Amino acid sequence: MASYGDDGVELTELTLGPPGASARRARRGRKNGHPPPSSSMIQAAYFVKVSMDGTPYLRKVDVAAYGDYLELVEALNDMFYCSTIGLMDGYGEWEHAVVYEDGDGDWMLVGDVPWEMFVSSCKRMRVMRACEARGLSSNA
């Protein structure tokens, strides 16, 4: 129950600390005795760097924010202002293909493994010309 002063204004507790300290306390669940949010409510972000052949810059993508490969490819098309990025399930269809480096350091085509396995093993991604990516395909 909130306590009120003589003028009817709700009294609040003032805490001092460095900037962001209250947010950190809230994330840890210590503020006001509230329990931390359940793990089912928290979705971890998993950022990886993405490069594209012919561009002088990198982008960072949270792969855990997407539900499947098609959403990821659409986002990459938007990021690099390109509409020629696609999955390598059909040859000659796309000018660019997306490959990723897994935990073992191997480069693999995006779409070759189940989505959950990709999210957990992707270390970085590269958008390369489709003709160069043909040798990486598991069904080539």
UniProtKB/Swiss-Prot annotation:
The keyword Transmembrane helix does not apply. GO terms for cellular component: nucleus. Residues 24-33 have a biased composition (Basic residues). One of its GO terms (biological process) is auxin-activated signaling pathway. Keywords: Auxin signaling pathway, Nucleus, Repressor, Transcription, Transcription regulation. Induction: Not induced by auxin. InterPro entries: AUX/IAA_dom, AUX_IAA, PB1-like. Expressed in roots, seedlings and flowers. A motif (EAR-like (transcriptional repression)) lies at residues 14-18. Pfam families: AUX_IAA. Residues 1-40 are annotated as: Disordered. Residues 45-130 form the PB1 domain. It is found in: Nucleus. The keyword Kinase does not apply. Aux/IAA proteins are short-lived transcriptional factors that function as repressors of early auxin response genes at low auxin concentrations. PANTHER family: AUXIN-RESPONSIVE PROTEIN IAA17, AUXIN-RESPONSIVE PROTEIN IAA26. Belongs to the Aux/IAA family. Homodimers and heterodimers. This is Auxin-responsive protein IAA26. It comes from Oryza sativa subsp. japonica.
